[in-house]
Structures are given as C-alpha cells and as structure tokens.
Amino acid sequence: MLVLFVATWSDLGLCKKRPKPGGWNTGGSRYPGQGSPGGNRYPPQGGGGWGQPHGGGWGQPHGGGWGQPHGGGWGQGGGTHNQWHKPSKPKTSMKHMAGAAAAGAVVGGLGGYMLGSAMSRPLIHFGNDYEDRYYRENMYRYPNQVYYRPVDQYSNQNNFVHDCVNITIKQHTVTTTTKGENFTETDVKMMERVVEQMCITQYEKESQAYYQRGSSMVLFSSPPVILLISFLIFLIVG
C-alpha cells in the first residue's frame, strides 16, 4: 500500500509540471498578431487585428476608414488639403441679367453685338416679275435674325441700320459659305433689302424699350416718388 501511494503521488506531480500541447492562440500559432516565440510565420503585429500593420481597422494600413490608405476621408490621400471641392458658381449681377433679357443675347466673339429674335421675312417687291419670283423661291436662304449693338451707341437710326445690315450679311454669308452654299449677286441684292427692313424693325423695337427704361428710371428717381416709397416702407416695417 505504501509503495502504491508513493507511485500515484509521483504521477500527479509529473502531470502538473508537464506543458500543455499547442492550440489556438498558443505558442507555435501560424496566425498573425499573437506575439508567440515559436513558429510564427508572420511578423509581430502592433496590437491591431488580422491584417492590420499599424492598428487600423480591417484592411486599413494606417488607421483610416475602410479603404482609406492614409487616414483621410473617402478618396482622400491623407489630409484635408487633398479634399475635392465643388467649384463655386459664377455670380451674375441683376443688372447684367436685366440687360440681356431686355436687349437680346450677346454673341461671343463679335465685339458686343447681340442677336435679335427671329422675324418673319418681309414681303418685298423688286420691280419685276423675275426678281419677285426668285425672292419667293429663295427667301428661306436669307437671314431671319439680325445682329446689332445697343441703340445708345449710335447717334441716329441710319448709323444703327447701316452697321446692322453689314454685320448680319457678313455673318450669314460666312456661315452659309462654310456649309458649301454660295450666293449670287441677285442673292446679295435681295438680302440687303430684306435685312435692311428687319434692322429698321429692330431699331424701332430697341428704341422703344430704351426710352421706356429711361422713363422708368426718371420716374422712380424723382423726389416725390422716393418720399412716397420711403413712407410706404415705414408703414410696412412699423
């Protein structure tokens, strides 16, 4: 009995001193981030999760958000200086908007000329049947809009019309020739008559609008009107 007791006691002591076999998260692990001394195929990690070289989230090399290489926002290379900024819209003054709406669209590259609204081509008689028939058959080839400058840049109607006719025929001829169509002397003669009538109509329209704008400015700038407007504002605010 004494011998059996001693043998059993020795076996229990040896069991307590015997090391445990390797397992999950123990020495000899092949997975990263354990810091074990034996058999690790990956370099020791700095406290991050799986695949985190420097303590970031999953797949984050330097501690940024998901898919962020250097800690910036989405698509940002590492700081606010690389952020994409939406370009600000250009400011348009009310004065320019009002002028464009009243006078027509300014044409780029023509030195301040504006393009008038489309008009119906006038019915013109040229004094003989051949030219009258030719005009009726070819009038669609002639301009139905004119180029012009503001009326306040001219001293009289004749100067406005002369400039309007020249620039309109020149632009229409260049544009049409580029498309492969040429004009005869008869075409040029008829275009001059047609465009002249349209330029006169445009001058009358622009002159009327110009004087109406001037009258409105004079009306609202008179002292009685200013006093009345100020009184109404005082009543509304008060």
Swiss-Prot record:
Residues 16-215 are annotated as: Interaction with GRB2, ERI3 and SYN1. GO terms for cellular component: Golgi apparatus; plasma membrane; side of membrane. InterPro entries: Prion (IPR000817), Prion/Doppel_b-ribbon_dom_sf (IPR036924), Prion/Doppel_prot_b-ribbon_dom (IPR022416), Prion_copper_b_octapeptide (IPR020949), Prion_N (IPR025860). Residues 83-93 have a biased composition (Basic residues). GO terms for molecular function: copper ion binding. It is a lipid-anchor; GPI-anchor. GO terms for biological process: protein homooligomerization. Residues 45-80 have a biased composition (Gly residues). It holds the Pfam family Prion. It is found in: Cell membrane; Golgi apparatus. This is Major prion protein. It comes from Lophocebus aterrimus.
